[in-house]
A protein has these predicted regions:
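Structural recognition of an alpha-helix C-terminal capping motif at a helix-to-coil junction
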Residues: 20, 34-41, 54-66
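Sigma70-family region 2
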Residues: 27, 38-55, 75-76
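A short, charge-rich alpha-helical start-of-domain segment used by transcription regulators
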Residues: 1-20, 33, 44, 111
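Internal acidic/polar
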Residues: 70, 78-103, 123, 162
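C-terminal edge and immediately downstream basic/flexible tail or linker adjoining helix-turn-helix-like DNA-binding
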Residues: 1-8, 80-82, 93, 129-130, ...
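A short pre-motif secondary-structure segment
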Residues: 113-117
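Arg/Lys-rich amphipathic alpha helix in sigma70-family domain 2
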Residues: 51, 61-83, 144
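DNA-recognition helix of helix-turn-helix
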Residues: 65, 69, 131-155
């Protein structure tokens, strides 16, 4: 597969997942797009072989998570302020926007595990490998993240019957 075909394959297969994961960390669309581009450039320059598509996906999401952590630690990010005073055009809210807003307001370590578990469908052990933390830590973060969401959303209104 030549470089152009590889780039198209990566963009088609992983761009959405990288953008969504990056946005859960950074809460900024432009920064998430920068992370996506950075990950693709690294992948295209290193030409790594993977055992399976699952290993490739986990490696790519791990690269994205690490790149997000690097941005969050950077001194540049600490010196800039988001444009919170900018006017957002009114748009109809999605039915689950309150839940999504609550998830996005969680601390990054809870937000990442909840995103990977519920939106990407990873198991706790896989999330641990992607984020570089023990499986028990993933379970703890999921439980604490759910508890915070329940407290934010008022509990029963959003709970689904089992």
């Amino acid at each position: 597969m030549n470089t152009t075909q590889r780039a198209e394959y990566l963009a088609h297969t992983y761009a959405d997942a990288i953008l969504r994961l990056s946005y859960t960390y950074l809460k900024n669309t432009q920064d998430a797009q920068d992370i996506c581009q950075t990950v693709f450039v690294r992948l295209l320059t290193e030409q790594r072989e993977f055992e399976s598509p699952a290993h490739e996906r986990a490696y790519i999401l791990r690269m994205a998570a690490n790149a997000c952590k690097d941005i969050l630690k950077s001194p540049w990010r600490k010196r800039t302020l988001p444009m919170e005073s900018a006017y957002d055009a009114a748009a109809p809210e999605a039915p689950d926007s309150e839940v999504l807003d609550a998830v996005n307001s969680l601390p990054p370590h809870y937000r990442a595990v909840i995103y990977l578990y519920y939106y990407e469908g990873y198991q706790a052990a896989e999330i641990g490998q992607i984020l570089g933390v023990p499986t028990a830590t993933v379970h703890t973060r999921l439980a604490r993240g759910r508890a915070k969401l329940k407290a934010m959303l008022g509990g029963m209104e959003y709970e689904q019957p089992v």
